[in-house]
C-alpha cells in the first residue's frame, strides 16, 4: 500500500482486512481494533457489528458505547448520513443518555417535545422502552453500560437481559481510568463468556489489555500489522508539531496579533478551559474583520450543528472552541 494516492483506498484496505479477520475468528468473543485517527474506525465498527449479526442466529442487538456524549452525538450524525433516507432503519436506532429525549418507536425525528398527541399508554410504552433498552441499536456512554452491568438498583437491572447475545462496541477505551483497565477486561471477558456477548474494543491508542488479565479466553486483533497503517505517509505525516512557543507564556494580545496577520483563512483556536475560550472570543470579536464563532461545552447540540454548518461555507472565519470541537 506504499503507492496509495487516496486515503479512502487505505481506509478500504483496513475495512476489508478487519472483516476478513473477523470472519476467520467468528467464534471468538473479544476483538481489538487499533487504527489511526481518521482511518474510518467508526464505519469499520458499523460493518463489523453488522457482520456479527449476520453470522449469528441469535445476536439481535448492538450497543455502541463511548466515553463522552459528544462522541455519541458525532456517531449518531454518521449514522444519519449513512441511513438517513431509510426511516425503517433510523427508527430502530436510539440514543440513550441524559441529554437526549426519549425515543418514540417508528420515528427517527419525533420526540415528546414536538408532538403532544400521545395517550397515556403511549407515554408508558415509551418509558418502558427506555428503561428496558428495547431498541435494536443503542448509542450511549459507558455510564449506561457499566451501570447496567454492575448497578444494584432496580432501575439498573431493567436492561440487564438485553446484554445477552448482543454485540458491544467500546470506542476510545484509553479514556477510561487506567487503574481500572485490569478489572475492566477481566469483567468484560467474563460477561462475554457467560452472556454470549461479542465485544469489539477499539481506539487509535489501544493499550494491550491482555497483559492485565489471567483470563485465557481468546482475543483477536483485527489488524495484522498496525505499523502498516500508523507509519503510512497518509497518517504518519499529517501533522507537524511545533514546540517553539512551548517554553514561554503567550498572552491574549500576542495571540490576537498573530491570528490577525493571517487574513482570508479559516482559523481554529482551541483552549483547554472554557473561561479562556470565552475571554479570547470576547477579545478578538472586537478587532476581527471576519466572522468569529464560539463553541464550548455549554453550547447546545443544535447550536454546535448550526455553527459548523454555517462555517463550512465560509472562506474566512475564526472559530474559538474548547476540546468539545474534537
What would you call each of these model-derived segments?
Residues 59-84, 95-101, 208, 274:
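Conserved Walker A/P-loop ATP-binding site and its immediately adjacent core
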Residues 86-150:
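Inter-Walker segment of RecA-like/P-loop motor cores
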Residues 138, 142-146, 156-191:
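SF2 helicase catalytic motif II
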Residues 205-262:
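Interdomain hinge/linker at the junction between the two RecA-like core domains of SF2 helicases
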